[in-house]
Swiss-Prot record:
Pfam families: ACCA. It comes from Caulobacter sp. (strain K31). GO terms for cellular component: acetyl-CoA carboxylase complex. Gene3D superfamilies: 2-enoyl-CoA Hydratase, Chain A, domain 1. SUPFAM superfamilies: ClpP/crotonase. The lineage of its organism: Bacteria, Pseudomonadati, Pseudomonadota, Alphaproteobacteria, Caulobacterales. This is Acetyl-coenzyme A carboxylase carboxyl transferase subunit alpha. Residues 33-294 form the CoA carboxyltransferase C-terminal domain. Transmembrane segments: none annotated. Pathway: Lipid metabolism; malonyl-CoA biosynthesis; malonyl-CoA from acetyl-CoA: step 1/1.
């Protein structure tokens, strides 16, 4: 069973607890005992999971996007990138582990890969600052994109952040400028770039790694200019109304594809990416490979033109 269940998953959790209890009884009762009962319960749990995830509202999707067991950047690197060599530091101030990146081979193709890393436990979450990057993280991203262009390598990014770190030190070191430079660098990159929103895509801290030719999004991920809690605090002076804000912000993958802010939705396993991380990772890999193959046929000038047209069209199309 999963270690963490969301509120709407409680009936599934109860059923899986019964499955576990029955499985333990079958071990003492002998081979084949309760086999049909266990299988029937598993089938029922799977059906409940499909039904629950088919009808998620925007706030529930936000909770799924933030699920602590959802695969993060390092999981995608481990599952998709061979011969990965991490590159550290911005060559100006420090190395920010909220953004991890380097060189590797994606299904045989040399690439530059980078993204936000949130961490999976207390130690790694603190190390990676919960995926909230400081200026040096975005300057590291610019450095990696510069390298990609110099050596004519495609860029693959994974976006998963609540937003850039808002601390005093980050602001003193030029957080806004660093985000702007990273966004700009992606928009004028002369090599193919594919970004995937794999969890949260929050504010400028997310778009700084998503100035890509193609922006993909996992089925239950979100992408927005501000968190639902932040929007509720501004609109109603009450962060507790985050659910109301989420319902009106058009932050889900399904909203975003209709608005033409993202280009493709990657389906998740029944029960979300956290229910079967390996399958989710391979689904993302298949989608990225598909997009990358088409983009690699374009010249640098064509890539820049396509990317510019894509972003200029946002706000003009899909709003009818």
């Amino acid at each position: 069973m999963a270690a963490h269940y969301l509120d709407f998953e409680r009936p599934i959790a109860d059923l899986e607890s019964k499955i576990e209890e029955l499985s333990k009884l079958s071990e003492t009762a002998g081979p084949g005992a309760f086999e049909s009962e266990i299988q029937a319960l598993r089938d029922r749990a799977q059906q409940m999971r499909k039904e629950a995830y088919a009808g998620l509202d925007a706030w529930q999707k936000t909770m799924v996007a933030r699920h602590p067991e959802r695969p993060h950047l390092k999981d995608y690197i481990a599952g998709l990138i061979d011969e990965f060599v991490e590159l550290r530091g911005d060559r100006k101030f420090a190395d920010d582990q909220a953004i991890v990146g380097g060189l590797g081979r994606f299904r045989g193709v040399p690439v530059v890969v980078m993204g936000h890393e949130k961490g999976h436990d207390t130690t790694t979450r603190l190390k990676h600052n919960f995926g909230m990057a400081r200026p040096e993280g975005y300057r590291k991203a610019v450095r990696l994109m510069d390298m990609a262009e110099r050596f004519n390598l495609p860029v693959i990014t994974f976006v998963d952040t609540a937003g850039a770190y808002p601390g005093l030190g980050a602001e003193e070191r030029g957080q806004a400028e660093a985000i702007a430079r990273s966004t700009e660098r992606g928009l004028v990159l002369g090599t193919p770039m594919v970004a995937t929103i794999v969890g949260e895509g929050g504010s400028g801290g997310a778009i700084a790694l998503a100035g890509a030719n193609k922006v993909l999004i996992l089925e239950h991920s979100i992408y927005s200019v501000i968190s639902p809690e932040g929007a509720a605090s501004i609109l109603w002076r009450d962060g507790a109304r985050a659910k109301d804000a989420a319902a009106n912000m058009k932050i889900t993958a399904q909203d975003l594809i209709q608005l033409k802010i993202v280009d493709r939705i990657v389906e998740e396993p029944a029960g979300g990416a956290h229910s079967d991380p390996d399958a989710a990772i391979q689904s993302v890999g298949d989608a990225v490979e598909d997009e990358l193959k088409a983009l690699m046929k374009l010249s640098a000038a064509e890539l820049k033109k396509q990317r510019a047209a894509r972003f200029y069209a946002i706000g003009r199309e899909g709003l009818q």
